[in-house]
Curated annotation (Swiss-Prot):
Protein name from the UniProt record: 4-diphosphocytidyl-2-C-methyl-D-erythritol kinase
Catalytic site: K12, D137
Species this chain originates from: Actinobacillus pleuropneumoniae serotype 3 (strain JL03)
E.C. numbers: 2.7.1.148
GO molecular function: 4-(cytidine 5'-diphospho)-2-C-methyl-D-erythritol kinase activity; ATP binding
Enzyme class: transferase
């Protein structure tokens, strides 16, 4: 492979998020549902025999050793003792700190893509285990299927929620995930429910009230758009989203977003666009 290959690095949403317990070690147990979107960044890969990892558009002021894309490539290269190299570029569309998985998705696309084109032969499960050291959400993107997560996020069950249309908006604020989980008003005893029951119920997010109480930018945007649609938080934010049955309905609401707010329209995907493109088998069939 000498030509440049462009691979999708999709966004994700947490369609619901419930916190069921705080453990003695400080970690929170949760129940959440991840779904991919047909919108995201693009990762370009150009494999070569140099043995070097070159970032084509490194982030200014960030050492390459701290860049998740570089770290993912080096991790796979070292783990498999691969002698090949690659030039890697990224076209960013996803907002930083939006809670839609940009960095984790980029790392996963690099792991999956280079494993494929370097022919290093790791299974998706092996790649997911490797990717966990890069971030808690990386295995979701590596496995490539919409998933119900429990525990501290490590117990995954593939599932197929409805593939709706979404309007996703990014309030002009950065939110500290750590601060949200340390907040004394955060619910920590939501009863555990079975996946089948959760899929039949209306979905909410236990973090949303805390975030809306502390970040007026999120509260004001949700309130402003309430006359058009009910938006809710994904993860700990900052992005919010609303669900629609059709693209036309989504476009009609999107037209009312404030001009200074970044946003996009996307369709839910239970199989990652990356895995669709590479025709990879996802877990479990």
């Amino acid at each position: 492979m000498t030509k440049k290959i462009i691979l999708p690095s999709p966004a994700k949403l947490n369609l619901f998020l419930y916190i069921t317990n705080k453990r003695a070690d400080g970690y929170h147990e949760l129940q959440t549902l991840f779904q991919f979107l047909d919108f995201g960044d693009d990762i370009s890969l150009e494999v070569n025999e140099s043995g070097e990892i070159e970032l084509l558009n490194a982030i200014e002021g960030v050492a390459k050793e701290q860049n998740l894309i570089y770290r993912a490539a080096k991790l796979l290269q070292n783990h498999t003792a691969c002698s090949k190299g690659a030039k890697i570029g990224v076209t960013k569309r996803l907002p930083m700190g939006g809670g839609v998985g940009g960095g984790s998705s980029n790392a996963a696309t690099v792991l999956v893509g280079l494993n494929h084109f370097w022919q290093t032969g790791l299974s998706l499960e092996q790649l997911a285990e490797l990717g966990l050291s890069l971030g808690a959400d990386v295995p979701i993107f590596v496995r490539g299927f919409a998933a119900f997560a429990e525990g501290v996020g490590e117990k995954l069950v593939a599932c197929q929620p409805r593939e709706s249309w979404y309007v996703v908006l990014k309030p002009n604020v950065s939110i500290s995930t750590a601060a949200v989980f340390q907040d004394p008003n955060l619910p920590r005893n939501t009863p555990k429910r079975t996946l089948s029951r959760l899929l039949s119920e209306e979905w909410t997010n236990d973090c949303e009230k805390v975030v809306r109480d502390h970040y007026f930018e999120v509260e004001d945007l949700i309130a402003e758009l309430l006359q058009y649609a009910t938006f809710r938080l994904t993860g700990t934010g900052a992005c919010i989203f609303a669900e629609f049955e059709s693209e036309a309905e989504a476009k009609a609401v999107f037209a009312h977003k404030p001009h200074n707010i970044f946003g996009f329209i996307a369709k839910g995907q239970n199989r990652s666009p990356l895995h669709q493109m590479l025709n990879l088998t996802t877990f479990p069939q």
